[in-house]
Amino acid sequence: MLSGGKGADTLDGGSGNDVLYGGTGNDMYRFAIGAGVDRIEDYDTTTGNADVLSIGQGVSINQLWFQHVGNDLEVSIIGTGDQITIRDWYSNAAYHVEQFKTSDGKVLRDSQVNALVSAMAGFAPPVLGQTSLSTDYQKALNPLIAAHWK
């Protein structure tokens, strides 16, 4: 378990399965290939708060899979067992990470996540070892992915 406090914290669980507590402030959570199964527990009601999920090198926007599970948001790197869950995402906006940012500078805002979740809900998640989306998935999802990641 890694815990931040007040202020801007950077939390990186590395490999393995971790719980990351952000606290208040503009926190950065790191997620990459080899990260394992991590969980973010973030609750911040501060106006203008800007927490970021930083996605490591070698992960493209087309490799991220978004799912609504209970009250949580799960983000997986397809082809791997790596997953990060943002606990209680669907309970209240105070639990949100406000931005998802890739190493090449692409950004997805929390207000855009549900469009991807809804589109991906119509498909089964790619199986372990499948590192790219099938042609059918690409046709359906790539326009939406490109429209929301800027």
List each model region and its residues.
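Acidic, glycine-rich calcium-binding repeat modules characteristic of RTX/beta-roll
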Residues: 1-69, 80-96
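Low-complexity acidic/polar repeat-biased segments
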Residues: 76-150
